[in-house]
Amino acid sequence: MDRYPDLNPDAGELETAEVVVTDDVLVKAFALGPGAEMEPHDHPDATNVFHVTEGTVTVLQDDEEARVTAPGVVLHERGRAHGARNDGDETAVLTASLCPLPGGG
């Protein structure tokens, strides 16, 4: 029943895995090695929620950024640019929940 993936990125690398995929929701895991970044992007028709599960990430949202340490939750409203960066020395992990899926329910 546990779908949490085993991700182990090197420094500067970002590893991802789809954890849950249904007709109306996507949960994806992101493991950021030290120095890695998830480039800012947006989802015009979907809400995105980050759940920081391990370590500390710098969350980027439009022109703002904030350090979020596990356990932490960050809401990204529809159409709001968002991303994440690992400024630390250890791997950081977050999941991102996206719903509804673009073109989905």
Model-identified regions with their sequence ranges:
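A short, N-terminal "cap"/entry segment at the start of jelly-roll beta-barrel domains
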Residues: 1-28, 39, 74, 105
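Short, charged/polar surface micro-motifs in flexible loops or helix N-caps
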Residues: 23-25, 34-36, 54-56, 65, ...
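Short, conserved beta-strand element in jelly-roll/cupin
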Residues: 31-33, 44-59, 97
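Short acidic-glycine-tyrosine-enriched beta hairpin
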Residues: 63-79
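Ligand-binding loop in jelly-roll beta-barrel domains
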Residues: 78-104
